[in-house]
Amino acid sequence: MPKQNRQPTREKLLDITFDEVYIHGYTATSVDTILKTAGIPKGSMYHHFKGKKELVLAMVEERLFPKMELFFDFEPKEGKSVTDVLQGTFAAMAKNKPLITYGCPLYRLMVELSPIDVTFDKLLSTRVTKMQDNLALLLQKGIESGEFDETLNVKDFASYILESTWGVLSLSPSLSSSKHFLLHSKFILETLSNYNN
């Protein structure tokens, strides 16, 4: 029975932590703010997490990473070309208001914490590598299907897609828009079309 009571508290803490850290950053987010927003006493948090760092690490694993798979969905789709998959993912990202307004949550956290915390650096870097590898595999399928020429360096182009996308998502909210993001994605697809067979 106690386990049932703790589970909703833990889930609520993770959800609110994701929102707070995404919008305000790790440093500006206080445990007190998270607890106040959640309506949870501090003692309840310590049943689940030793402190802020452990809470945010759990949030990264259980909330941020699954969201990244949705935001950057570069999985091959039956009956669709690689270009169609990329186009569909970019279109979905352009419709995601928080992503356009606040940028990529993984990238934001990485920029803030990787230089100062080894634990976060390893965790976040591992995810970035996985994303690049998945994207490279998708591009490789494009080569194997004859969509792209073999001269396409899939690893380099996967890095280019992620890094340039993070760059455009890092603009200040006043400069960001779905239209601007779609223009950026169009440039990526035009560059990729240079390798079309």
List where the protein language model places each region.
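N-terminal intrinsically disordered/low-complexity leader segments
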Residues: 1-8
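Short alpha-helical elements of helix-turn-helix
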Residues: 11, 15, 104-107
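Helix-turn-helix
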Residues: 12, 16, 20-54, 58
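C-terminal peripheral helix-coil segments that are non-catalytic and often amphipathic
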Residues: 24, 88-96, 132-141, 145, ...
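Hydrophobic alpha-helical connector segments
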Residues: 58, 72-102, 154-161
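Short, basic, alpha-helical segments at the C-terminal edge of helix-turn-helix-like DNA-binding modules
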Residues: 61-68
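Amphipathic alpha-helical packing segments from all-alpha helical-bundle domains
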Residues: 84, 118-144, 156-159
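Amphipathic alpha-helical segments used for helix-helix packing
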Residues: 98-119
